[in-house]
Structures are given as structure tokens and as C-alpha cells.
Amino acid sequence: MSGVTSEPIAMDATRFQHTPYYCEENVYLLCKTLCENGVAEATCSDLFVVFISNEKKQVPLWHQKASTRADGVVLWDYHVICVQRKKESDSEPLVWDLDSTLPFPSPLASYVTETIQPSFQLFAEYQRFFRIVHAPLFFKHFASDRRHMKEPDGSWTAQPPPYEPIVAQDGILHNLSEYIAMSGADTLSSLDPETVTAAISQKLGVVVSHTQLQDLFTKLP
């Protein structure tokens, strides 16, 4: 019998570790906490880490806390969220975005509508792509020594988290660039169940477009 709560619990995002501009580490710790407190499976098998970016590293997202605009839009180089998809359940996948002003968590459909705004016409260079990585694989392989947050003179572009950098289980110190590298050429050509199952079992998961995102979560094993 699962110890996971049957209904989504509205939470205060400030209860979770959050360091501005270190979203990949924030989500790493968020997923760990959700698994530890019973909101997600203890194995984290129902959690997926989603990197959002593109070739130009310019992705517009709405309803972001960092925005100074009324519509909350921010042009990120990349962003990272957690999506929870409960197995053997008809409930909609949930998005956990610590940087969003939307309810925490939010149903995936409403998050896509409000944050991705697929109906908003964008130039091709601003199209968003999504790399979906199964959380257990993310915990095993992801690493960041925070080099991407340092200026040439060694100073920080933003104050780093107070804890030690994340190291992969095999000792790798930094591979963030592998996770945020994505383009239209990387997206799945088919969302048939066999292709999705094979892709999601890979270290770097699978890349999809915004039109494929919601459908993907219905095809996961």
C-alpha cells in the first residue's frame, strides 16, 4: 500500500530550499523533499525533472516571480520545473515550479496555458523545448559545480546556495550543459508508447515541443 497522499496538497513554496537563479538545484532538492514527506513516491518514480530551453537560450515564460512586468513574463536562458505524474491514477499531472506565481502545485494543463502560453505567436528563435528526465535518473547522473554562474574573474553572477555542489554518483562534477542543450532537431518524431518508454529510460531523457508536452505524460509507462 502506497504512502502517497491521494489528493494534491496546496503548499507554501517558501517551505522549500530556493536560491534565485539556481533552478536546477532547487528542483533537485524539491524532488527529494516531495519523496521524503510522502507527497511523491518514496522512490521518486512519479516525478520528472523538466528543463525548458532552446538553441538561442532565450525562452519566454509567464507568471514568473522574477518578472517586473504585470504579465509576469521573463526571458530565461533556461528554466527547470518538476512534473508529478501519479501512476495508476486518473488525476492530472502536477507542475511544481518554485519560481511561478501560479498555485503550487498547478495542474499541467493550466500551467501550460498560463506559463507557456502556446497561443501566443512567437518568432522561431523563442520556441520552447522541454527535456523530460525521470527523477531517479536525474539524482544518479546530474552534477553542477556552478561554473556557469561565474564571471571570468571568478566572481559570482548570483550568490550560490549555502550547501555543497551536487556531484553525480559516478563522480562527475558538472554536466548541466548536457541537460539544457536542445533544439527542434532533438524532439521525438513519434510519441508511440515504445519510443517514449525507451527514451525516458535514458540518462538525458527525452526532448519534446510544447505541442507534445501534455501528450507525452499520457504515454509514460
Curated annotation (Swiss-Prot):
GO terms, molecular function: protein-N-terminal asparagine amidohydrolase activity; protein-N-terminal glutamine amidohydrolase activity
Record field: catalytic activity: N-terminal L-glutaminyl-[protein] + H2O = N-terminal L-glutamyl-[protein] + NH4(+)
Keywords: Acetylation, Hydrolase, Plant defense
This enzyme's EC code(s): 3.5.1.122
InterPro entries: N_Gln_amidohydro_ab_roll_sf, NTAQ1, Prot_N_Gln_amidohydro_ab_roll
Residue numbers annotated as active site: 23, 79, 97
Pfam family, one: Nt_Gln_amidase
Sites of N-acetylserine modification: 2
A GO BP entry: defense response to bacterium
Complexes and interactors: Monomer.
Function, in words: Mediates the side-chain deamidation of N-terminal glutamine residues to glutamate, an important step in N-end rule pathway of protein degradation. Conversion of the resulting N-terminal glutamine to glutamate renders the protein susceptible to arginylation, polyubiquitination and degradation as specified by the N-end rule. Does not act on substrates with internal or C-terminal glutamine and does not act on non-glutamine residues in any position. Involved in immune response.
Family that this chain belongs to: Belongs to the NTAQ1 family.
Name listed for the protein in its UniProt record: Protein N-terminal glutamine amidohydrolase
Originating species: Arabidopsis thaliana (Mouse-ear cress)
